[in-house]
Amino acid sequence: MGKRFAKQLGQFIVTLFGITFLTFCLTYLAPGDPVTMLLETADTIVSQQTIDETRAQLGLDKPFIVQYANWVVNAAHGDLGMSYSAKKPVVDRMLEALPGTLILAGTALVFTILYALPAGILSAYNRNKWIDYVLRILSFIGVSMPTFWLGLVLIYIFGLKLGLVPIASSRITATGVILPAVTLAVVVGSKYMRQVRLVILEEMQKDYVIGARARGVSEMKILFSHILPNAVLPLITILGVLIGWLLGGVAVVEMVFSWPGLGNMAIYAITMRDYPLIEGFVLWVAIAYMCINALVDASYVLLDPRLKRERA
């Protein structure tokens, strides 16, 4: 168990170094000057001397590898630098936006499970029947639709035409989270529904299900007492991947709905060339994704006693 933990920790650290180094390379090679964006406005032209002094204050005059090494050392102590656009520490700016993203992703996850699990099970139990074809077509459409396009359609129908929900929300509200959460849930839920269908179909063909049916056990009991307990592990694995996608993929949806979250913050940071904020966002996504994978891996041990004995 200790060796496995050490191995996972090593992979965690190496992955973080790789992701942050790549992000640093991209921001370093990106066209444009963040200092010029920071200082100049439409009515003001800043002297080259002021630009050079500001660049030196921010440490942007140093070689690339020195900048990266300084950032890694500071990040290890919880200091991700100052946001150019927000004029405050990156950590503080991200903590302001974090609740919005967590609420949106959490609500979308609930909608995803409520939609995908019943639809996937229903599709599997009615394989090659009309309801199966309808659900599979709907899931194909859901997977194929870009989130920004679906979001705009939902805004037009439920916001502009019907007036049931706000078109956009700059604050976190119960009504404001509905449309962006539904937008995410349709796309993510369609992916998950197809995986649920495949997992349930695979379990339905196994000997223990055939034997239970031969003994006259009801379909409901077979589903809830046999199929679903055995399908939990693969379904949790797939769900863990989708949760990671939710946390990292909310940026477009947050922008469309003006939702105050990390994704919206990151897109604004990109337009303003706010490199410390961009790097902080990428670090957050990487850590969140790897932590979710670690939790999924740990859940295996809790749900499957055989794995616990193997790793003891």
Give the residues covered by each predicted segment:
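Hydrophobic alpha-helical transmembrane segments of membrane transport/permease proteins
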Residues: 16-69, 162-179
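Membrane-water interface segments at the C-terminal ends of transmembrane alpha-helices
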Residues: 23-29, 58-59, 73, 137-166, ...
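Hydrophobic alpha-helical segments of integral membrane proteins
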Residues: 9, 50, 54, 64-80, ...
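Alpha-helical transmembrane segments of integral membrane proteins
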Residues: 2-3, 94-131, 170-312
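Residue-level signal for discrete positions within transmembrane alpha-helices
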Residues: 12, 97, 101, 137-140, ...
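Hydrophobic secretory-pathway targeting helix
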Residues: 2-24
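An internal, D/E-rich "acidic patch" concept
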Residues: 60-117
